[in-house]
């Protein structure tokens, strides 16, 4: 997991090093369309030169991956008082059926192996 995070960070840094406003497909209008509300979090060509690449990378990542509703710290999360969704039950049943199918497949394979060993042993 740490390796994946490092690889992602490295890719982001390499992309940032290659990012040029005139050559990229990204535009400030696209940032406004994505819903970045805070003007401090908007990327601009001069950001790379003021305060280094780290700040620019953080700003770019904040625009590209906006904060999701479920990403608040544990203290800020709302409690879920409503009953579980029907899709939860569906996935639970699907998981149970897959386990049963796997068990049945293992039984059949064991029976086939027993028959083969019995015939070889004779």
From Swiss-Prot:
**Gene name on record?**
Ucn
Lineage, opening ranks = Eukaryota, Metazoa, Chordata, Craniata, Vertebrata
Its BP terms in the Gene Ontology are: aerobic respiration; associative learning; drinking behavior; female pregnancy; negative regulation of appetite; negative regulation of blood pressure; negative regulation of cell size; negative regulation of feeding behavior
Q: Would you identify the family this protein belongs to, as annotated?
A: Belongs to the sauvagine/corticotropin-releasing factor/urotensin I family.
List residues, modification Valine amide. Answer: 120
Signal peptide (from-to): 1-25
Q: Which InterPro entries match?
A: Corticotropin-releasing_fac_CS, CRF, Urocortin_CRF
Q: Let me know which tissues express this protein, per UniProt.
A: In the organ of Corti, detected in the inner hair cell region (at protein level). Expressed in skin (at protein level).
Q: Name one GO cellular component term.
A: axon terminus
Q: What is this protein called?
A: Urocortin
- Which stretches of the sequence are propeptide? 26-80
How does this polypeptide assemble, per the annotation?
Interacts with CRHR1 and CRHR2 (via their N-terminal extracellular domain).
The protein's matches in PROSITE patterns, at most eight in alphabetical order, are given as: CRF
Keyword set for this entry? Amidation, Cleavage on pair of basic residues, Hearing, Hormone, Secreted, Signal
State its role.
Acts in vitro to stimulate the secretion of adrenocorticotropic hormone (ACTH). Binds with high affinity to CRF receptor types 1, 2-alpha, and 2-beta. Plays a role in the establishment of normal hearing thresholds. Reduces food intake and regulates ghrelin levels in gastric body and plasma.
Name of a matching Pfam family: CRF
Observed phenotype of the null mutant: Increased anxiety-like behavior, reduced Crhr2 mRNA levels in the lateral septum, normal basal feeding behavior, and hearing impairment at the level of the inner ear with shorter outer hair cells, higher threshold for auditory stimuli and higher distortion product otoacoustic emissions.
Q: Which SMART domains match?
A: CRF
């Amino acid at each position: 997991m740490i390796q994946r995070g490092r690889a992602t960070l490295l890719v982001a840094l390499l992309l940032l090093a290659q990012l040029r406003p005139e050559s990229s497909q990204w535009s400030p209008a696209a940032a406004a369309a994505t819903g970045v509300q805070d003007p401090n979090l908007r990327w601009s060509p001069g950001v790379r030169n003021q305060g280094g690449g780290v700040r620019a990378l953080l700003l770019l990542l904040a625009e590209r991956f906006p904060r999701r509703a479920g990403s608040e710290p544990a203290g800020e999360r709302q409690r879920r008082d409503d009953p579980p969704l029907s899709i939860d039950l569906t996935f639970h049943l699907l998981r149970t059926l897959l386990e049963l199918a796997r068990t049945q497949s293992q039984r059949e394979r064991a029976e086939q192996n027993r028959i083969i060993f019995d015939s070889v042993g004779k």
